[in-house]
Amino acid sequence: MYQLVIAEKPSVAQGLAAVLGAGQRREGYLEGNGWLVSWCVGHLAELADAAAYDPAYAKWRKEDLPILPEHWKFTISPDKRDQFDTLRTLLRREDVAEVVNACDAGREGELIFRTVYALAGCSKPISRLWISSMEDEAIREGFTHLRPGREYDGLHQAALCRSKADWLCLFYTSDAADDMQ
C-alpha cells in the first residue's frame, strides 16, 4: 500500500520526494519507497464565476442582486486540467491507503488541498504535514509528527469562508465599477 503526498508546488514535491526516497519520475508525480508524491500547482480549482450559475449573470445587472449561490461551483483552469486529472487518479487508486496534505502550512494551503480532495471524490484518511522549512531534517521531523487532517477542519472552513466572501465582494464591486465606466 502507498501513502500519497500532495504538495502545493512541484518544487516542494521534489524536495519531499527526495527525502522520502520517491525518486522514480512519472507523469505528474514521483514514486518510490511506498510513497507517491504529487503537487497541485497552486490553485488548481477555484470558485466558478457568476455566469456558471446562470448565463444571465455574465453581465452585471442590479436587478439580479443578490447572487448567493446555494451550492458553490468550482472550475479547473484548462492549463491545469492534466495535473488535476493525475491527482484525481492517484486519490482514487485502490493501493493508496492514506493521503498526506503537504500543501503550504496555512489557510490557503489547506484550501488548495481540500478543494482538490473533495472534487476528486476522495474519502481516504488525511494526515497533515505542517512544516515551515524544506531542510531534510525538518521534513523528516514533520513526517514523524503527522497530525490527523480533521484537526485542521476549522482552518479549512475559515479559508473557504474567506474565499466565498472574496467572490461575493469581487463580483459586486468589480462588475459594478466596470458597469459605471
What are these model-predicted stretches?
Residues 172-181:
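Single conserved hydrophobic/aromatic residue that forms the stacking wall/gate
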Residues 1-171:
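Intrinsically disordered, low-complexity regulatory segments
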